Curated annotation (Swiss-Prot):
Pathway: Amine and polyamine biosynthesis; spermidine biosynthesis; spermidine from putrescine: step 1/1. GO terms for molecular function: spermidine synthase activity. InterPro entries: PABS, SAM-dependent_MTases_sf, Spermi_synthase, Spermidine_synt_N, Spermidine_synt_N_sf. Keywords: Cytoplasm, Polyamine biosynthesis, Spermidine biosynthesis, Transferase. It is found in: Cytoplasm. This is Polyamine aminopropyltransferase. It comes from Streptococcus pneumoniae serotype 4 (strain ATCC BAA-334 / TIGR4). The active site is at 155 (proton acceptor). The keyword Ribosomal protein does not apply. Gene3D superfamilies: Spermidine synthase, tetramerisation domain, Vaccinia Virus protein VP39. Belongs to the spermidine/spermine synthase family.
């Protein structure tokens, strides 16, 4: 008998994956956690019924989350990751020797342990000596930060449940305060294709645009995300993601990537017309 996992995107749309085996199922204080083995995407991590990432496509998310701000900020030393318990973002950050401190704020200790067991390649990033994990609420952690970080990455992907506070006006304001005078914040902007997701994208962009002088959005193709399309937010106190992009400097690093390139960096900010329209409408609101 075939076993299938289905993630509901809308009442009329599902993402369905043939499943070879359920590797893990448990419930932490914060969420339901499941790991499935699939023929098409390898192991997938599911939180509260939603695919967080898969072996096959997580490199896209991690590379676009990290390399974009690292290729723009001229001298980053300290990075804060809100969420990130799987270690994927940390693993890419550790490729940069100039980083002196990488702080991970993840409330769910069980999630970290599950990822260490079933996704050891990603979780290896958590073992770098520059990485410190704080098992705390991200919003509460930020309230005690001021002028501390060069880059903040909000690695929470959905504005629901225990991560809802990471998509509020307070969170973006606290992130602004926690950044140094030339700091950059990267956040997950979601997928704008379906109506409910579009509403969340609008809300995020409006709040960030009010909190930061520079607010831009870039894109990537991630097959397991809704509609296979994902947006990232780039918010900055000083640097523009394209005008201040150090293309030649990044290329000289000769880092191995599977998705991100210097040319793609610029192209990722060239958005479809319907997405531009959504963002421009929200930028006009106060």
């Amino acid at each position: 008998m075939d076993l299938w996992f289905s993630e509901v995107h809308t009442p009329d749309v599902k993402l369905s994956l043939r499943t070879a085996k359920q590797l893990y199922a448990g419930k932490s204080e914060w969420q339901d956690i499941e790991v499935l083995d699939t023929p098409a995407f390898g192991k997938i991590l599911i939180l509260n019924g939603h695919v967080l990432f898969s072996d096959a496509d997580d490199f896209v998310y991690n590379e676009m989350t990290v390399h974009v701000p690292m290729a723009v900020h001229p001298n980053p030393k300290k990075v804060l990751v809100i969420g990130g318990g799987d270690g994927g973002v940390a693993q890419v950050l550790t490729l940069y020797p100039e980083l002196e401190q990488i702080d991970i704020v993840e409330p769910d200790e069980m999630l970290v342990e599950v990822c260490r067991e079933y996704f050891p390649d990603f979780a290896a990033g958590l073992d770098d000596p520059r990485v410190t994990i704080y098992y705390q609420n991200g919003l509460r952690f930020l309230r005690n930060c001021e002028d501390d970080y060069d880059i903040i990455i909000n690695d929470a992907t959905d504005p629901f449940g225990h991560t809802e506070g990471l998509f509020t006006k307070e969170f973006y304001g606290n992130s602004y305060r926690a950044l140094k005078e030339d700091g950059i914040m990267i956040y997950q902007h979601g997928s704008p294709f379906f109506d409910e997701d579009e509403s969340a994208c609008r809300s995020m962009h409006r709040k960030v645009n009010q909190a930061f002088p520079i607010s831009r959005v870039y894109q990537a193709h991630i097959p397991t995300s809704p509609a296979g399309y994902w947006l990232f937010g780039f918010a900055s106190k000083k640097y523009h993601p394209v005008k201040d992009f150090d293309k030649e400097g990044w290329k000289k690093r000769q880092l191995f990537t599977e998705y991100y390139t210097a040319n793609l960096h610029v192209g990722a900010f060239m958005l479809p017309k319907y997405v531009e329209d959504i963002l421009e409408e929200e930028e006009g609101k106060k």
